[in-house]
């Protein structure tokens, strides 16, 4: 099976996902850029609209003028046609009258006949005008056909040059967005190879706390939840959007029936999962109904600062969500203080499976899950980096060296959001985001 290895924005192989011969578009798979965005290589036609903006604008203006002239000529032709019909009927009437006068030459008085004859003599010059009018009408019809042909030729030139109108460009952009979305879906899971520079969203609250979005919500749902402090807190603020969170507006308050401990909370599919204060109980609180749906003890889990992260703060239990579901990271006496990773059933909170990583929890600054891999940091130190990874699919580990900038020197919450492929952190009263770069292995469609 042929595989494409990709990391960052470098492509070591090429796989055409989409191709449009008539437009010249080709779209290739790629990986995430350092800022965390999915990047796909698009090969565009050689004749780019950007290089022809001036001529395209002139062409559009010329087409508009031709269309205006064409419309004016159509109106003129319609009016001319009506006038021509009237003149032709008058011509017929004149000839009929002239014939009748000639036939009635002997039956009318000389005076009356002379008067009618003089009137007919006055009308005779109109015959030549009528002939010219008919000739002009034929010219108008011919010109209208030429303008119509010119308009068609200009439209063909416009299409060849790529001078598309706004609606056409909008449709093309939407189609390309759909292609890029399919590219992102194809990338899927990967191994962490880089963490971006920090992006400070806001400075709010005390030194310790947590903030998060729902990892299972649709893209249109951008609510943000904010929980200040690391023990005995009960107040959760829900902001309508990230913009509202930045401005500190449009929020509602939830008052939890039981206080929390630590900062390892997570929002998953409309519910908050947190550690009940002074216990090893996991609580699932549903925001919409404002009620606790289920709570359950985590067997043997330490609590009340028995096995916290190196920074303390009642961080005995840390809940996480990645592409595969809900996880709990904690420690038991049976595991001698080493980190235990457990997969939880989000409905019942029962442990589905557990792994002993062999890594002492008190030596870790923070941890997060990506694609079933637990990444451990020394974020309590100045030269912060991700330096340990445990793979649940193979029950194996390795030491890594992925540095990142600990801008405010005290990270008390670090969690991965698979929907946004970003790390949410609370750093010394600052709410901060990091984008991640993943190393992908993509199987070519159709390969065995």
Swiss-Prot record:
Domain spans labelled Olfactomedin-like: 188-440
Biological process annotations from GO: locomotory behavior; neurotransmitter receptor localization to postsynaptic specialization membrane; positive regulation of smooth muscle cell differentiation; protein secretion; regulation of vascular associated smooth muscle cell dedifferentiation; visual perception
Keyword annotations: Coiled coil, Cytoplasm, Disulfide bond, Glycoprotein, Membrane, Nucleus, Secreted, Signal, Synapse
Residues carrying sugar: 68, 149, 269, 304, 393, 435
InterPro entries registered for this protein in UniProt: Noelin_dom, Olfac-like_dom, Olfactomedin-like_domain
Disruption phenotype: No gross abnormalities with normal lifespan but mutants display reduced exploration, locomotion and olfactory sensitivity, reduced amplitude of the first negative wave in the visual evoked potential test, abnormal motor coordination, anxiety-related behavior and changes in AMPAR complex composition.
Any one Gene Ontology cellular component term annotated for this protein: AMPA glutamate receptor complex
The keyword Signal is annotated on this UniProt entry: yes
Coiled-coil ranges from the UniProt annotation: 52-79, 130-187
Residues spanning the signal sequence: 1-14
Disulfide bonds: 189-371
Annotated function: Involved in transforming growth factor beta (TGF-beta)-induced smooth muscle differentiation. TGF-beta induces expression and nuclear translocation of OLFM2 where it binds to SRF, causing its dissociation from the transcriptional repressor HEY2/HERP1 and facilitating binding of SRF to target genes. Plays a role in AMPAR complex organization. Is a regulator of vascular smooth-muscle cell (SMC) phenotypic switching, that acts by promoting RUNX2 and inhibiting MYOCD binding to SRF.
Name assigned to this protein: Noelin-2
Gene source species: Mus musculus (Mouse)
Organism lineage: Eukaryota, Metazoa, Chordata, Craniata, Vertebrata
